[in-house]
């Protein structure tokens, strides 16, 4: 019944300071670049499991309490998300090389979590199951329903909804690369009249829709803009 233990090695002095200041980011980056390693036959999973079971101890530390207080005070400023800032944030994250995203996404470039209904599901199967699950929740029970996809990414969900249900889909994205890629897909599939993707902030949309879906985009809205988001969605239905 010995208490669990994990041995980690920090390979330079700056790592401990970075972890103390921003553990959520610094631990992952240190493990990724090799400046934090797990020793004596342990794994990163052992380390995370042990850390998770001791969060109450960490939260009691003075430095952690100060950091949490500062984080809570500055979070509204960090998440201030007016139109111009939103566009720059999206460009920084998504307007990158296609080759990069193809390295780790499924063939449909779904960027949100898959729906793993089996331990043996592949990434492709999980992402298709997610799209099927979303379509079911939207109750697209007749062709031609006008459907808005806020944060439409590379277009996979919108195209799937049209192909499976006959929905008329408009997707909104702030990424030039995503919009260009998604529009090319509609051209290749010859469905431009039924599915379109616009380079536009959802706050500028004025058309009315039968259904609205937004997957994995809400984290970009910002706490101060939650009410604005739901009010806008309500006005478009």
Protein language model features and the residues they cover:
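Conserved SAM-binding loop of SAM-dependent methyltransferases across substrates and taxa
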Residues: 154-166
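Conserved class I S-adenosyl-L-methionine
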Residues: 143-151
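A conserved beta-strand element that flanks and buttresses the S-adenosyl-L-methionine
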Residues: 213-218
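Conserved SAM-binding loop
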Residues: 182-183
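A short glycine-rich, Lys/Arg-flanked "PGG" loop and its adjoining helix->strand segment in the class I
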Residues: 227-237
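Feature captures hydrophobic
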Residues: 1-127, 133, 140
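A short acidic, Gly/Pro-enriched loop at the edge of an enzyme's catalytic core
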Residues: 203-212
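Conserved SAM-binding strand-loop segment of SAM-dependent methyltransferases
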Residues: 189-202
